[in-house]
Every structure is written in C-alpha cells, then in structure tokens.
Amino acid sequence: MASPSKRREMDMMKLMMSDYKVDTVNDDLQMFYVTFHGPTDSLYQGGVWKIKVELPEAYPYKSPSVGFVNKIYHPNVDESSGAVCLDVINQTWSPMFDLINVFESFLPQLLLYPNPSDPFNGEAASLLMRDRAAYELKVKEYCEKYAKPEEILSDDDDDDSMSEDGSDSDDDDDDEIVGKADP
C-alpha cells in the first residue's frame, strides 16, 4: 500500500484529470476546492457548487472533510457552515474509497436521496417530511439564488487572475513607464 502522502498525490492527480475543476490552495494538497454540478434528473440539476475539501494527514485512512461553500437547501447539509452529514464519509469511510468516489457517487447520492431522519438542517428535513412540494420549491429557489453556473464559474475565473495577496494580477499600473523615453 502506498504511503498516505503518495496516495493523496495519486488521488489528487486522478481528480484533476477527471472532468472536475479543481482549485488548489497551496502545494501541500491538503485543502482544495472542486466545482460540483448537481446530478441530472434531481432537484439540484443545473446548480453548481464550490465544494471545499480538506484531507487529514492520515488520508486515506481517515475520511476527507467536505463542505458546500455556496448555500444549498438540503436536510443533510448545514445551511450556515455548508458541512455535510454523510455517513459514508463521516463514519464508514474506507481507504478503498478515493476522491472520485466522493464526487461521482457519495455527493450525487446524497442530493438524490436526502435522509430527513439524520438532519443537519432541521427546517429542510421537517419541510421534506411535511410538504414535499414546498420543499422542492425551496430547493429550486436556492439553486436559482445561490448556485447559478455563470456566477460560480465566473468566480473561478476571477480567482485565477488574483494574486496571493488578493490583488488583481492583471493590473498593469506598476509597469507603467513615467516620463519620456530618451531619443
């Protein structure tokens, strides 16, 4: 079995070579963001979320921490923090799983099959059990308000042009030549 750091590198490489957009924060690969599209044929179809992923030192023996950066209305996602209540990730994680499993299986399954009996968002769980039509409407409202593809994807493009200090790296003011050139 590969060492945890080698496995982390291999899993990150697989994820980056997949169809997911991955934005790394620094070179240690312990925290990064993944652009995640809502599953087809779900209430979340058409929505786009930025998912924050943190890998513990002991990854893959310990599960990654996964959270939604932009808001999502779901019984198993904390509305304020974006933390995900996902048994497979939080309790039954196995080193046999990898990051691709998180984005191709675990998160889509969570969105397709919410579990109102184990909620992080009690209001969403209650509404799902009480009035499914109202719940579905609220999910769609959140998707339209917080998960617009053009806003999330343009935020990613903006991030690419930002330097580490948060200033726009395309700013050419510092390069401007003052005065006249010698003839």
UniProtKB/Swiss-Prot annotation:
Gene3D superfamilies: Ubiquitin Conjugating Enzyme
Pfam families noted in UniProt: UQ_con (PF00179)
Span list, region Disordered: 148-183
Protein name according to UniProt: Ubiquitin-conjugating enzyme E2 6
Chain ranges of the UBC core domain: 1-148
Pathway: Protein modification; protein ubiquitination
Catalytic machinery residues: C85
Organism: Arabidopsis thaliana
UniProt keywords, alphabetically: ATP-binding, Nucleotide-binding, Transferase, Ubl conjugation pathway
Superkingdom per UniProt: Eukaryota
Composition bias, Acidic residues: 152-176
Enzyme class label: transferase
Tissue expression notes: Expressed in roots, petals, sepals and silique walls.
Lineage: Eukaryota, Viridiplantae, Streptophyta, Embryophyta, Tracheophyta
Listed GO biological process terms: protein ubiquitination; ubiquitin-dependent protein catabolic process
PROSITE patterns: UBC_1, UBC_2
EC number(s) recorded for this UniProt protein: 2.3.2.23
Function: Accepts the ubiquitin from the E1 complex and catalyzes its covalent attachment to other proteins.
Family stated for the protein in its record: Belongs to the ubiquitin-conjugating enzyme family.
Record GO terms (molecular function): ATP binding; ubiquitin conjugating enzyme activity; ubiquitin-protein transferase activity
Induction annotation: By senescence, but not by heat shock.
InterPro entries the record matches: UBQ-conjugat_E2_core, UBQ-conjugating_AS, UBQ-conjugating_enzyme/RWD
Reaction it catalyzes: S-ubiquitinyl-[E1 ubiquitin-activating enzyme]-L-cysteine + [E2 ubiquitin-conjugating enzyme]-L-cysteine = [E1 ubiquitin-activating enzyme]-L-cysteine + S-ubiquitinyl-[E2 ubiquitin-conjugating enzyme]-L-cysteine
